[in-house]
Design a protein with these regions (language model features):
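Membrane-interface transmembrane helices that cradle and orient dolichyl/undecaprenyl
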Residues: 25-43, 70-73, 290-291
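Hydrophobic alpha-helical membrane-interfacial segments at the cytosolic entry of transmembrane helices
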Residues: 42-48, 62-65, 77-103, 278
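Hydrophobic transmembrane alpha-helices of multi-pass, membrane-embedded glycosylation machinery
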Residues: 61-72, 271-277
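Membrane-interface anchor segments at the N-terminal boundary of transmembrane helices
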Residues: 162, 172-173, 179-246, 256
Length: 291
């Protein structure tokens, strides 16, 4: 049993459900390529929409998977059309009711929610960057609490007073985020690089969890990622399409998270279930070579 998954399901957050749904999406997507059943692409569309309703970042999988259906070698045009059609039907019947509900209630097209602008503002904030430079755990905790309760609360009140609808508020947040970038371009560049690196950090944040827990987490993450990528590399020649698909899948979520706040618990649902599979392959090949 993977300790990280066991820990996550004891916490009330979206990641465990999101992990299940994106993993199910990949399963049904890949099964759809191998079978003639229309159920698999349909269920892939349903799963990716449910994942998007859990965490909107999964919306990027909809065009990605549709394109992958189109460029998969060896699929005839008729089957490709059927796969894409069933996939998009699954997306539509799952996502449309919520979007329609939002339009009826707010008079605006809101696919999932209006948090994009707010999250972009957080990911461009000078104060958020300064938090990442604090080394002491107690000082980090105090500064984080002050940011959430004082600075953010003040700006939230200003945004709510200046806009009267969900998407209008999101646009105000986005505009403030762009102003952050304009006012501090070098800082934003450094922060973006830091977020890009931290996304792949193989230990918990010592600022938040302390050095001991960070070290213990590294003893779990490092072997998984080393063995997982070794197992994945084994597919580079035996199944190059799967190899490229998984690599692009990982990179897609990586790039999508960089403009926003980055913590490794956002990476885990995307990468770790897949790498566990490839870790199993790497271990199996290792023991076969010992015989």
């Amino acid at each position: 049993m993977y300790p990280v998954f066991l820990y996550q399901i004891t916490d009330i957050r979206t990641e465990p459900l999101f992990m299940f749904l994106v993993t199910a999406t990949l399963y049904f997507f890949l099964r759809g390529l191998q079978s003639a059943s229309i159920a698999h692409p349909l269920l892939a569309g349903v799963s990716v929409s449910l994942a998007s309703l859990t965490r909107p970042v999964a919306l990027i999988l909809i065009p990605f998977l549709a394109i992958c259906y189109m460029i998969r070698p060896g699929i005839r045009a008729k089957k490709m059309t059927a796969l894409i059609f069933c996939f998009l039907i699954g997306v539509l019947i799952t996502l449309a009711p919520w979007t329609i509900r939002n339009y009826i209630k707010y008079g605006e097209v809101i696919l999932v929610n209006n948090a994009g602008g707010y999250n972009f503002w957080r990911g461009s904030s000078k104060e958020m960057y300064e938090l990442t430079t604090i080394k002491d755990q107690a000082a980090f905790s105090t500064a984080s609490e002050q940011f959430e309760t004082d600075h953010q609360r003040t700006i939230t009140r200003e945004v709510n007073e200046s806009a009267d609808s969900p998407m209008a508020r999101s646009r105000v947040w986005r505009r403030r985020g762009l102003e952050n970038i304009k006012d501090h371009p070098e800082l934003y560049f450094r922060y973006s690089l830091k977020k890009a690196v931290n996304y792949w950090r193989l230990w918990l944040n010592p600022q938040e969890y302390g050095k001991t827990k960070a070290l213990m987490s590294a003893l779990i993450f490092v072997p998984l990622y080393v063995l997982g990528f070794i197992g994945l590399l084994g597919y580079r020649k035996t199944n190059p399409w799967i190899f490229r698909f998984i690599i692009f899948y990982f990179l897609l979520f990586w790039v999508a998270h960089i403009p926003f706040q980055v913590v490794i618990r956002f990476r885990i649902p995307v990468t770790d279930p897949i790498l566990l599979v490839f870790t199993g392959r790497a271990v199996r090949v290792f023991f076969q070579n010992l015989r």
